[in-house]
């Protein structure tokens, strides 16, 4: 729709703000890149939802109408929904487990190859704790899910993974967990990381494009088999199972270093009211 409206702007005079949600680095076709560059230049503003995305837009397309505005998050609603114990009770009965007693990390999102769930499975040979489980929330590509479940079975890890499918309210599950793991090869902006921080939960995330570094406020180079950590979570290289195991082991052994109150304060700039002000300010500037 963005490009359609940009095309119409060639013929009609109206104000246009486009919101771009995916990484520009995923546009590999040279012809498509030229089309995107030309049409987006017609917009009054192109909102990018992460700094990496904005930098890529400026670098690749040389347009000067890029603006950084994060996705809005209703933090109060997320906190409210996280108190729904019915979600926990339903999972406990349906999957014969007790989320109130087990120690687990949560993975939330579409289960597709881009999410690299196999990295978690491969990391288990180097995880030192016998008590850790992984709760996977979401649906997706049936073939990929079957392949992951086959990999889990081949490594005798069936007791370590629970696939609960899609949940309309994953926040109660996140709240009970030790933290959230994201393994993606790439993201536009991983909203689940903001939602986890909102609930005071630390993050283990792949250093993918784009979002995790920005959300975690982590800088510095990251080599193979290495991790970078701060009070909000841990970053590891994409697809690096050994580094992911190091991250999980560190978080297990040093969980108290990730302070919930500091984690929660990090997400205020993603609050829906803050983002609303940014949109209103941009609209006012364009309509003067």
Name the predicted role of every residue range.
Residues 1-12, 25:
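An aromatic- and histidine-rich active-site surface loop
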Residues 16-44:
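A conserved, positively charged/aromatic
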Residues 43-80:
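A short, active-site helix/loop in glycosyltransferases that binds the activated sugar's phosphate group
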Residues 103, 107-126, 143-147, 242:
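A conserved mid-protein helix/loop that constitutes part of the nucleotide-sugar donor-binding site
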Residues 166, 185:
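Aromatic "clamp/platform" in nucleotide-sugar-dependent glycosyltransferases that forms part
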Residues 202-206, 211, 215-217, 225:
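Short hydrophobic beta-strand element within catalytic cores of glycosyltransferases
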Residues 217-240, 250-255:
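Conserved acidic donor-binding segment of nucleotide-sugar-dependent glycosyltransferases
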Residues 239, 253-286:
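A charged, aromatic-enriched C-terminal amphipathic alpha-helix characteristic of glycosyltransferases
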């Amino acid at each position: 729709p963005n490009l359609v409206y940009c095309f119409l702007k060639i013929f009609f005079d109206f104000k246009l703000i486009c919101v771009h949600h995916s990484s520009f680095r995923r546009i590999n076709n040279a012809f498509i890149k030229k089309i995107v560059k030309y049409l987006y230049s017609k917009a009054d503003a192109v909102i990018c939802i992460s700094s990496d995305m904005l930098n890529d837009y400026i670098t690749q397309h040389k347009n000067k109408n890029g603006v950084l505005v994060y996705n809005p998050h209703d933090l109060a609603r997320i906190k409210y929904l996280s108190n729904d114990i019915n979600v926990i009770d339903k999972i406990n009965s349906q999957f014969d487990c007790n989320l109130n007693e087990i120690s687990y990390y949560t993975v939330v999102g579409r289960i597709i190859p881009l999410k690299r769930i196999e990295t978690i499975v491969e990391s288990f040979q180097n995880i030192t704790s016998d008590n850790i489980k992984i709760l996977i929330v979401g649906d997706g590509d049936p073939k990929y899910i079957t392949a992951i479940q086959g990999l889990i079975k081949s490594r005798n890890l069936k007791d370590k993974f629970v696939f609960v499918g899609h949940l309309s309210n994953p926040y109660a599950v996140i709240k009970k967990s030790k933290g959230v793991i994201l393994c993606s090869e790439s993201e536009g902006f991983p909203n689940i990381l903001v939602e986890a921080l909102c609930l005071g939960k630390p993050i283990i995330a792949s250093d993918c494009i784009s979002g995790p570094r920005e959300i975690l406020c982590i800088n510095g180079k990251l080599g193979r088999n290495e991790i970078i950590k701060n009070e909000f979570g841990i970053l590891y290289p994409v697809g690096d199972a050994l580094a992911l195991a190091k991250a999980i082991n560190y978080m297990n052994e040093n969980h108290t270093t990730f302070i919930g109150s500091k984690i929660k304060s990090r997400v205020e700039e993603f609050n829906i009211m803050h983002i609303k002000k940014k949109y209103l300010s941009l609209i006012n500037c364009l309509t003067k």
